[in-house]
Amino acid sequence: QRQMCIRDRYILVKGEKASASRGVGKTLQEYLDQWNPDALRYALASALPEQSDTEISEDEMIRRNNEELVAAWGNLVQRVFTQIQNNFSKISEIDETVEVDKKLLKEMSESYDIVGQLIEKVELKAALQESMRYVSKVNGYLNETEPWKVIKEDEKRAARILYTALEAIDSCANLLYPFMPSTSDLVRSAIPRETENLWGLNKIKTGVELKEIGLLFNKFD
């Protein structure tokens, strides 16, 4: 397997270039003692200085962890998994897709070319931002379709919404894998698929139980 080393610009900590010898910033091991490795990878990749020096603070790293990983991505996975497990004994694809479902799945299908091109150009910060934009799209889809309300009157439609969201979550895990491989694998291994595209939209199996998944990330106080 090929390894790629990227020589980048400098990361600044409180206006100074990070330097272990001068005591500016923390060592990697000091961060790993406190952080989920994937959360640390995300925080650092979000601040990658590709064209010019960039400044990063621990407060900003914590904010990204809490707001983007815990509240946006982790919460998305948890609420879809929980709603499927609590309301259906197995993954169901019952109702036909409607326009809002088709729109999300089309966007997820197109996401691979968009993010892939950014990665090929080594625009990793932009690729990560774009990947998280799709997480926001799935959250927006759920907020618009409100399956927790729909299920009270139309169980088949609620099942379709959650199935569509699960397909999109699987794609989000694919997009985020280059940046957060461990947690992405946790998500992907919990979702049963009919297809095994690592970089493409997958068809999710129906009639089977969804595996349990724990919290992906912990919130910093």
Give each language-model segment a name:
Residues 1-6:
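Short, small-residue-biased leader/transition segments that mark boundaries at the very start
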Residues 8-9, 46, 130, 134, ...:
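Short acidic/histidine-centered micro-motifs embedded in hydrophobic/aromatic stretches
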Residues 9-99, 193-215, 220:
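Catalytic adenosine-cofactor/nucleotide-binding cores of aminoacyl-tRNA synthetases and other
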Residues 20, 31-32, 61-72, 100-108, ...:
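Secondary-structure capping and boundary motifs in well-ordered enzyme cores
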Residues 26-27, 111-113, 170-172:
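Short hydrophobic "helix-edge" motifs at membrane interfaces and signal-peptide entry regions
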Residues 53-58, 109-117:
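Short, charged/polar, low-complexity loop and linker segments
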Residues 77-115, 135, 139-155:
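Conserved, charged catalytic cores of large soluble enzymes
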Residues 117, 122-123, 132-221:
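Basic, alpha-helical terminal appendages of large translation-related enzymes
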